[in-house]
Amino acid sequence: MTARVCVARIGAAHGLRGEVRLWTFTEDPIAVTRYGSLSTKDGARQFEVTHAREVKDYLVATLTGVTTREEAERLNGTDLYVARDKLPATDEGEFYHADLIGLAAVDVAGKPLGTVAAIHNFGAGDIIEIAPAHGPTLMLPFTDAVVPTVDIAGGRVVIEMPGEIDGDTPDQA
């Protein structure tokens, strides 16, 4: 398991006083205000969210040490991480996306498909990205039907390839 987990990404500046748009990756967006110190990926900068309000599908937040629009603009695109021990424990069948990255992906017969490269959400649900050793990346819906088994301790996810892309249907060019 990873020692730190990405919980938010700083977006565009908001207003003139250093507020930023904050895209959170937590079930409860406001939870980032309770985690204490958030750091950049390299750990070089630390921030605390001192104030946040929900606007549409993001937060408008005030971060410690960011007081001008120019400072806020320079942070656009910065990912913010929190120490794993600050996060709540997961329930049975739940996990943090960070725990999936790097797991082996195998089909239901145990044949290797590749490695979990990322989990995406483009608005219509989670997508699991599998990077095979050779060939194109697989982007599959992260549903119980397609990913019936997530075995963090065993270091693998089991993929039930959807019929539309499993290669069993002939090309119709």
Curated annotation (Swiss-Prot):
Major location category of this protein: cytoplasm
Domain note: The PRC barrel domain binds ribosomal protein uS19.
Organism of provenance: Nitrobacter hamburgensis (strain DSM 10229 / NCIMB 13809 / X14)
Gene name of this polypeptide: rimM
Source taxonomy: Bacteria, Pseudomonadati, Pseudomonadota, Alphaproteobacteria, Hyphomicrobiales
This protein's name: Ribosome maturation factor RimM
The entry's keywords: Chaperone, Cytoplasm, Ribosome biogenesis, rRNA processing
PANTHER family reported for this sequence: RIBOSOME MATURATION FACTOR RIMM
InterPro entries associated with the record: PRC_barrel-like_sf, PRC_RimM, RimM, RimM_N, RimM_N_sf, Transl_B-barrel_sf
Gene3D superfamilies in UniProt: PRC-barrel domain, RimM
Record's function text: An accessory protein needed during the final step in the assembly of 30S ribosomal subunit, possibly for assembly of the head region. Essential for efficient processing of 16S rRNA. May be needed both before and after RbfA during the maturation of 16S rRNA. It has affinity for free ribosomal 30S subunits but not for 70S ribosomes.
Biological process per Gene Ontology, one example term: ribosomal small subunit biogenesis
